[in-house]
């Protein structure tokens, strides 16, 4: 049940809304009074949220399939008659891969999901967003700006999402459509848990992830959701921005080389 009215009467589409960050965004918009369309290619999570949250509906959609995306937009308009906000959250972070372990085919598939899925939905939604003078929120990643080891394809796709956000903000400003992105850092999600489980010491990996932030913890999906509602509602003078939801992970100096790296440190004269 909605507990607020910050976005009451508005209609929001959230891709990848069935779990993790997407589910946190769905909950935040429902709690702000919006009607939310949950888009996901995994039916189980989306259906469960639909049953749990009055004001939310689920539409099965794979954002890499343009026909699915066309149906998503047309069905949203058929049901609600308007569209005020699109949150492009659907994406994937593959397990760690050295550059020589990646493939062009795998890179293309990740581009289809992380970048072109965002492009396709945004393009098809723009006629309706222009009518409502709505907004687009793209979920990028901190690593799109600062890099990440053993993640070349992922980092490239997320850097492109941030760049596309800024370009689209320029193109859509004359229509009153705002375009922003959120770049999360370490957010505790099922995906993070799955990736940690692949490591030799999952507990140590999780601890390392927590200590990467000056705040000493990972973020929660609800905190990304709160940022999305802010961008959609109060942030009327913000367009083309990258809002970092990172716990300060990008701040300060840190050890970048492996601790086993041989170094020839100079002696300090006594």
Swiss-Prot record:
Domain of life of the source: Eukaryota
Record-listed NAD(+) binding positions: 19, 21, 40-41, 62-63, 89, 154, 158, 187, 189, 191
Catalytic site positions: 154
Catalysed reactions, as listed in the record: L-fucose + NAD(+) = L-fucono-1,5-lactone + NADH + H(+); D-arabinose + NAD(+) = D-arabinono-1,5-lactone + NADH + H(+); L-galactose + NAD(+) = L-galactono-1,5-lactone + NADH + H(+)
Statement: the UniProt record of this protein carries the keyword Nucleus: no
Assigned protein family: Belongs to the short-chain dehydrogenases/reductases (SDR) family.
Gene designation per UniProt: HSD17B14
EC number(s) stated in the UniProt entry for this protein: 1.1.1.122
Gene Ontology BP term (one): L-fucose catabolic process
Top EC group: oxidoreductase
Protein name, per record: L-fucose dehydrogenase
Effect of residue 148 to A: The catalytic efficiency (kcat/Km) is 30-fold increase for 17beta-estradiol and 11-fold for androst-5-en-3beta,17beta-diol
Subcellular location, principal: cytoplasm
UniProt keyword NAD, yes or no: yes
pH dependence (UniProt free text): Optimum pH is 8.5 to 9.0.
